[in-house]
Swiss-Prot record:
This is Enolase. NCBIfam families: eno (TIGR01060). The lineage of its organism: Bacteria, Bacillati, Actinomycetota, Actinomycetes, Micrococcales. CDD domains: enolase. One of its GO terms (biological process) is glycolytic process. It comes from Leifsonia xyli subsp. xyli (strain CTCB07).
Amino acid sequence: MAAIEAVGAREILDSRGNPTVEVEVLLEDGTVSRAAVPSGASTGAFEAYELRDGDKGRYLGKGVEKAVDAVLDEIGPAIEGFEASDQRIVDEAMIELDGTDNKKRLGANAMLGVSLAVAKAAADSADLPLFRYLGGPNAHVLPVPMMNIINGGAHADTGVDIQEFMILPIGAETFSEGLRWGVETYHSLKALLKSKGLNTGLGDEGGFAPELEHNRAALDLIAEAIEKAGFTVGSQIALGLDVASTEFFENGVYRFEGQDRTAAEMSAYYTDLANNYPLVSIEDPLAEDDWEGWAHLNAEIGSTLQLVGDDLFVTNPKRLAQGIQQKAANSILVKVNQIGTLTETLDAVSLAQRSGMTAVLSHRSGETEDTTIADLAVATDSGQIKTGAPARSERVAKYNQLLRIEEELGEAAVYAGRSAFPRYQG
């Protein structure tokens, strides 16, 4: 393996036109690799700190020159000479250099860019694809794509409270077949929306953002689109939600569909939805601080539904350990920029899987062409990936990378399919 010779960084744009950090790492053997950092719209209060400039006269305060400078002036010089293959040592050195609990001094966006670029450089130097370098010789499982095809909440300007309505092609035989099913359903939905005179404009993650009366209307439209595309709702293509309920939680109540609801009332709502629609997964059904509500919900419906903690856990092993102890969820959403280093991300996935939980690798609403999470999904044997609709090139880039990985694996490739959702009884 080769040592790190130099680290560079620059300010680039994400899919929402906001600045983000891109890092390049040069190794002593001449290898040059780069990584770009995503950014979220609905962010958990406990996420690692995203360092922005705050200068309203430049990019409306969202510039990342401070984070770029942190890479160039502090992080780079501190890790030069380290072996690129010593990922944990590199990441721990950055954490120590930052010296804060939430990476506020150097910025999680600066640290993550370096962490991912180092991993890519090590893989490139070893002449291995990233999924193989990180996952070892047994990495061979392609994830089920959780495709967000109707956007609401913080990802769209509509009257729908739930942030994401997803389709999951669990009945397909291969990843490429599952992707095709999702694409055909997506186009079927677009035609259906047009026929009903509804808006076909896109939200941040490539899904449609029609004005609808209520959340169930979105589920009904998707079910109809699945059938019109020639697939069976439930057994071939199931449904998933990201409620992002922290966005409408205030003073101990959920302001949902025009009513103030308790955690128990939200739990009853989800139970009713699951009884009427083929739901396999609900993300952030309750708020990030409602530990008691989460534990109650998991006890009520966790045996038949995947309950995913995003804002609840923020990819943080410490918060995940608390959730495991309280039995607050049965799955974790994994976003690399929530925690800020690859090592901590992999630690969170490992802890979840050892504890009998599932893990879902996820993009952010502000993405780039970087495809790292596609490789991570295969490397960690997560069996699930959430990376938007099959539209907008920053989303499609991840799907295309998974197609390449499937092709490279050849006959060894296995599609997770229904096995990724062992609790689903439909």
